[in-house]
Amino acid sequence: MLPVIPSFRSLVFATACLAALAGCAGSVPPQIQRLPERVELNSVPFYRGDMYQGAPQSLAAVLTSQGTVITPGLLEKPLHLPGGEAGLQQNMQTLAREYGLVVYPLDSDLSALLEQVAAGNPVLLRYTEGTAFWSGPRYGILAGYNRQKRTVLLRSGMNRRLLMSFSGFESAFKDAGGWAVLLQRPTQLPANVNPQRWLKAADELAGAGQEQAAARATKTLGATH
């Protein structure tokens, strides 16, 4: 007769499996667990290229997604390339404001980035690319993620769909300084917007000579808060 009560060894094995599964689920922050399981922003364009740390390609892709017809080559001179690689982070933000976009900085944690992607906002960021023998900064666009597989999807360099694990991406992202921004139209609030941060970004837009765009950004926030 087959035993009805499982053996002690079977119970131990089953308990261990359940504990392992619970541990895996618990390792993902609650803020991420609440997001949709999988998102990919297919409308975000991709410009292939490795030159200048991928900055012109990434910026052109975000500008295009916001309605500006532009190519990476047209951005090289305004970004002071070649020769201005050290100032790319600041120059990209300055140029985005000249196109009338609000440069909204994000917190440097994964949940904050994925929250924006889930809301349909591509994230412009910098991360470290390389190996144990060589590494360097690279700009890219966070355009998707898979919560179950714990991967993010980047538009970067020669890869339209560069997949990285959550942990690998977080390490590369923070190693490069944890810089990430949204480039938003003045009427397009980020998900879970921080009012003070948005108003500061609007002031910076006005300081770049885009007073009307800055006024629209302020009005948009006032209509919802």
Predicted regions mapped to residue ranges:
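Active-site-adjacent substructure of cysteine-protease-like catalytic cores
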Residues: 102-155
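Noncatalytic regulatory segments and standalone regulatory/sensor domains
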Residues: 25-28, 148-225
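Short, flexible beta-strand-to-coil junctions
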Residues: 18, 127-132, 184-187
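C-terminal motif of bacterial Sec signal peptides marking the signal peptidase cleavage site
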Residues: 20-23
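Bacterial N-terminal signal peptides that target proteins for export
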Residues: 2-13
